[in-house]
């Protein structure tokens, strides 16, 4: 039983990239926070031979006393059948739900590799890549003229989270997000920064705890005025006042991930009818 | 039965962002390609009251003859219980597998909202944000000195897919990816471009069908020499020859998504032992 105490092996087996399988596995395993785990990813396991290679790995680990887990999103009968012979608990993540859907739709699922292809819906894929080009071109206010083409304009002080959020919105959701970095000039004005005036309905404010901002900026430019706690407090206070005056929707990014900030932006776009669903 | 013929409503209900729930739903529904669907996302449904609001929506749609589906990753008993009262097939995506895991680990899962928090593992999150800064700083070869700090260096002609791939690797996987854009000078040399010489083991080549490259570049600079089919054919041919001469791992991006290209890079990093799992 040499395996006791070792992080338990978690195999992620997919006939494609394995991103979905790993997401589900992590969503499940996060509910057992005390368990030490190690992930072993086996993407593109798309035939019985590849599955058998995984089974052999699992057997070797089991023989040395480890207790592997297998999570798979494959829908190929021969791959599933092979995996079921491994000395491990197999989490077949799709099959049971496919059976339920077969009943709902009164038609059999189309099984086999390649069914879930990221580029299958290639119009959606192209719009993601276009949105990414867009976000890169307009990053940090260098593309004022493109505000008119934006789905959303993220407004906030430097390093409040605008760039990661806009890239994430583009890559994951095909949303065209621009940034407007608030700076000294903007705080001396009462109303909106001039380039934003006609796009008020697209604005989304990002705020952040000044101490967190201070830490982030210090990593970038240690000892600078830009990174000082006084400057950070001043900028965040003025930005918050501006957001309040304009009645902008605001998200605090201090302890939010890009996924969470993006979810807030998407919810806003949906509420205002600019995005379906 | 006014609902017949309408795209069928697919509710995505999560106590968090809903990304995992939507990924699973899409992985399942892609096996029924002929079914018209519309997605209705209800993230942050984290208590019985919020769940009841979703149930009311479902009831209204069902009353007008539609047949909604509900996909949920919630693990909160009160939310699940409420959803089960809706006139819709509910796909409870985690519960059954949590029960299996409870048996495997011989301990009960920690249920409730916030269990699956993107920033819970904040070291991993910070490394993703750092990798993103890194990718942005080194995009398109402007950061030669940072090649030493890179996990991988993507090499290819302009618009072969380097930038989206490096951003995706950073945002999703915390991988530090740099780019090296191959240009005229590089093709006149026999060996590696000078800045890359000492980092050969980190190189990953991206190639693309010249006609596809021509189409992409034409969108960007119509009628230019840069976009001409002759120039595209020349560059791709010379790049491929260079990759072959150096024995680099190469991925054809012509009909691959960033997810797929990234999976190829990750597989390489794992094979060479530079990345666990």
From Swiss-Prot, chains A, B:
Known role: Bifunctional serine/threonine kinase and phosphorylase involved in the regulation of the phosphoenolpyruvate synthase (PEPS) by catalyzing its phosphorylation/dephosphorylation.
GO MF: ADP binding; ATP binding; phosphotransferase activity, phosphate group as acceptor; protein serine/threonine kinase activity
EC class: transferase
Catalytic activity line of the entry: [pyruvate, water dikinase] + ADP = [pyruvate, water dikinase]-phosphate + AMP + H(+); [pyruvate, water dikinase]-phosphate + phosphate + H(+) = [pyruvate, water dikinase] + diphosphate
Protein EC: 2.7.11.33, 2.7.4.28
PANTHER family on file: PYRUVATE, PHOSPHATE DIKINASE REGULATORY PROTEIN 1, CHLOROPLASTIC
Similarity-based family: Belongs to the pyruvate, phosphate/water dikinase regulatory protein family. PSRP subfamily.
HAMAP family: PSRP
Pfam family name, one: Kinase-PPPase
Keyword presence, Transcription: no
Identification of the protein by name: Putative phosphoenolpyruvate synthase regulatory protein
UniProt-listed InterPro entries: Kinase-pyrophosphorylase, PSRP
Swiss-Prot/TrEMBL keywords: Kinase, Nucleotide-binding, Serine/threonine-protein kinase, Transferase
